[in-house]
Regions:
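Acidic metal-coordinating catalytic centers involved in nucleic-acid phosphodiester chemistry
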Residues: 1-11
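N-terminal "first-domain core" detector
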Residues: 10-20
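Structured alpha/beta reader/binder surfaces that contact nucleic acids or chromatin modification marks
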Residues: 18-180, 185-189, 198-204, 210-246
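Short, hydrophobic beta-strand segments that form beta-sheet elements in well-ordered domains
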Residues: 192-194
């Protein structure tokens, strides 16, 4: 059985350029910074966290991490970048500096308008200072780690596993699906992935239920899962998150 998505998602997916990661997902130190950024329609980040390979950035999404925003964590707001500038931290007057040098270089992104996501993206597993994704994933992800998927293959397989695992076959029976040269088998409490009949990796169904994205990485074993230019994306963390030095 082949992994098939709804027709509207198929149409969007066909137009995605997976090499284009032009959405900056940034974190926040506190609620005051969130308010200042929303009111002033801007976001700022240490220049060291954005490499030349990460440019250009066309959108910014605000990740309210569980540690800083308990009870209201996730991505609720995003916006298109109107213009950007390399500035000194001391020039960002909307948010008073509490540490570091006022001469430290920062990128300041002016946002056309902050827009609410129709369905907020909920945190699960992943923690990072910043990450880069694409607009398709931002508009379709249910959980934060899904923003880190790096190809159409990964997206299709991950969503199909999310759909099937809750209804995994009882002991002694099996089910599965395929996409191009990838075959996934659910049997005997485990998930196994094969490419061209060669085993890639496996994980338990229970581990996928508890930590789906970490388990998904195991299915790819020695094969690179996250495909993007520049430094690799952060590894998934299970229990905590980090905020940037903003």
């Amino acid at each position: 059985e082949e992994a098939v998505l709804p027709s509207d998602v198929e149409a969007q997916l066909a137009a995605v350029n997976w090499d284009r990661r032009d959405v900056l997902v940034g974190t926040l130190r506190n609620a005051a910074q969130l308010k200042a950024c929303l009111d002033g329609r801007f976001y700022y980040i240490p220049a060291a966290l954005v490499t030349e390979e990460d440019k250009p950035i066309h959108y910014v999404a605000l990740f309210q991490t569980p540690r800083v925003f308990p009870g209201h964590a996730g991505i609720f707001w995003y916006g298109a970048v109107q213009h950007s500038a390399l500035v000194q931290r001391g020039s960002i007057l909307e948010v008073p500096q509490t540490h570091g040098s006022p001469d430290a270089p920062y990128y300041r992104y002016q946002i056309c308008q902050w827009l609410p996501l129709p369905t907020p993206i909920r945190p699960r597993e992943a923690g990072f200072v910043r990450a880069f994704t694409n607009l398709f994933l931002l508009e379709n992800a249910e959980f934060i780690p899904e923003l880190l998927l790096g190809s159409e293959e990964e997206y299709r397989l991950f969503l199909e596993l999310k759909r099937r695992v809750p209804a995994a076959p009882p002991e002694g029976t099996a089910s599965g699906f395929a996409w191009e040269d990838i075959r996934v088998l659910l049997a005997d409490g485990n998930i196994r992935m094969f490419r061209a009949e060669q085993a890639l990796g496996s994980c338990s169904i229970q581990s996928f239920i508890r930590y789906p994205f970490a388990a998904f990485r195991q299915l790819y074993a020695g094969q690179a899962l996250f495909q993007r230019a520049g430094p690799p994306l952060p590894r998934v963390r299970k229990a905590h998150d980090h905020e940037s030095a903003l």
